[in-house]
Amino acid sequence: MGDRAGRQGRGPIAGLVVAALVAAGCMAGGYDQGEPQQPAPPRSAQPESQTTRADGTTSVAEFKQDIQDAVRLAQRYWAEQFRASGERFTPIRRVVAYSREGEVACAGQGLPRNNAVYCSAGDFIAYDVNWSVAAFRQIGDAFLFYLLGHEYAHGMQVRLGIRYNFTIQQELQADCMAGAYLGDSVRSGALELEDGDLEEFREGLLAVGDDPDQPWFAEGSHGTAEQRSESFFRGYEKSLGACGLG
């Protein structure tokens, strides 16, 4: 997968930013319930014109590079969306890795293993590094771009003041937003997919889907694999306008 600065069209963001000033506090006490304090991984010094490619290796070095690339690409994408709408963009403060349950806390609550979350109280993304490396090796490097894109989308929901009554609505919208970020990045030339990357997205969504018997309205529901795939690829193919941002 690759990363090259690309120009985005005017997105459906402007009308939501004013509401965000009032509503952003709704999520300030906790974190999204994940798929699942250290400094953030250093930002890459690569020039913006360079294309990021996931080379398919499964080394720890490649994992770290893909995490950095995914965060940088998401930050650049959302900065462009806000800028195109004439709004100020504030990036998520940091991304932290952890390896033990409770090692990182959000609003006083220790984060569980085998997870990745966005903590609105601290405005950071945290992920279980052991779980993430295992998924990276089993599913592929494209999964990391989806995973970080999904969590980054939760941060954008907070900035836009988007809050639904049920968790599943919040989660499926974040899947759609992650799909839009990746699809738009591919179309603009900012991201270059390798053979098999789309299949890795599908496999990743299958891996994080809820049990089909999970109640739609249950707290913490994210959606079945089918629902999550539909939301992701709707955003991937149709961009942010298909994600119900306003």
Regions picked out by a protein language model, each given a short descriptive name:
Residues 152-168, 181-186:
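Catalytic Zn2+-binding segment of zinc metalloproteases
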Residues 27-31:
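Bacterial signal peptide processing site
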Residues 78, 146-159, 175, 179:
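Active-site recognition of the HExxH zinc-binding catalytic motif
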Residues 23-25:
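C-terminal motif of bacterial Sec signal peptides marking the signal peptidase cleavage site
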Residues 129-146, 162-168:
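Short pre-active-site segment immediately N-terminal to the catalytic Zn-binding motif
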Residues 68-71, 75, 81-83, 178-211:
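Short helix/loop segments within enzyme catalytic domains
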Residues 100-126:
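Catalytic zinc-binding patch centered on the HExxH motif and its immediate surroundings
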Residues 213-246:
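Pan-zinc metallopeptidase signature
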